[in-house]
Design a protein with these regions (language model features):
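Short acidic-aromatic low-complexity motifs
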Residues: 14-19
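C-terminal catalytic core of tyrosine-transesterase DNA break-rejoin enzymes
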Residues: 117
Length: 139
C-alpha cells in the first residue's frame, strides 16, 4: 500500500539563537511569525515563520551552540511570484544579497541571501525551460 504526503514539507533548522534568526526572517525578509515557544531563559526555543505557502521552523541547537561558521549543509529554495520585485524590495530594506539575480540553466531566475547562521536562502521564479550544460542531459 503506497502512502502519499498530504501536506507541505516544513524543514526544522537548528540555530544558535532562534530570536536572532526569527527577527532576520520577519524584519528583513518579510516572513510572518506564526508560532513559537519561549523557554525558561526568556529566549525562543523554537518558532515557525511563513512566506506565502512556505513554512520554516527554527529550533535552538543542542546546548545553544551556533552552527559552525560558513555555509551550512542545508539550503532553502523558495518560489516567489516575481523574483525581480522581491529582490528590489529586499535591497531597499538593506538586505545583503550574496548572489545576484541570475537565470540558471534549469530555467529559474534566482538570487541568494545568507541568514545570520550561514544558511543560504534562494528566491526564484521560473522563467524558462531547462537548458542543461553541454555534455549533460536531464533524466
Amino acid at each position: 500500500m503506497s502512502q502519499t504526503v498530504s501536506g507541505r514539507v516544513m524543514p526544522i533548522i537548528a540555530v544558535g539563537s532562534v530570536d536572532e534568526v526569527r527577527n532576520f526572517y520577519v524584519d528583513a525578509l518579510g516572513f510572518q511569525h506564526v508560532m513559537g515557544m519561549v523557554g525558561k531563559d526568556g529566549q525562543l526555543d523554537f518558532c515557525t515563520v511563513v512566506l506565502g505557502e512556505a513554512r520554516v521552523m527554527f529550533s535552538r541547537a543542542p546546548g545553544g551552540s551556533r552552527p559552525s561558521a560558513g555555509k551550512q549543509p542545508v539550503e532553502i529554495y523558495l518560489e516567489v511570484d516575481d523574483v525581480d520585485t522581491f529582490h528590489n524590495r529586499l535591497k531597499k530594506k538593506g538586505v545583503a544579497i550574496s548572489d545576484p539575480l541570475t537565470v540558471q540553466w534549469w530555467g529559474d531566475r534566482t538570487f541568494k541571501v545568507l541568514d545570520p547562521n550561514g544558511y543560504e536562502i534562494w528566491f526564484y521564479t521560473n522563467v524558462a525551460e531547462p537548458k542543461p550544460p553541454t555534455g549533460a542531459k536531464l533524466v
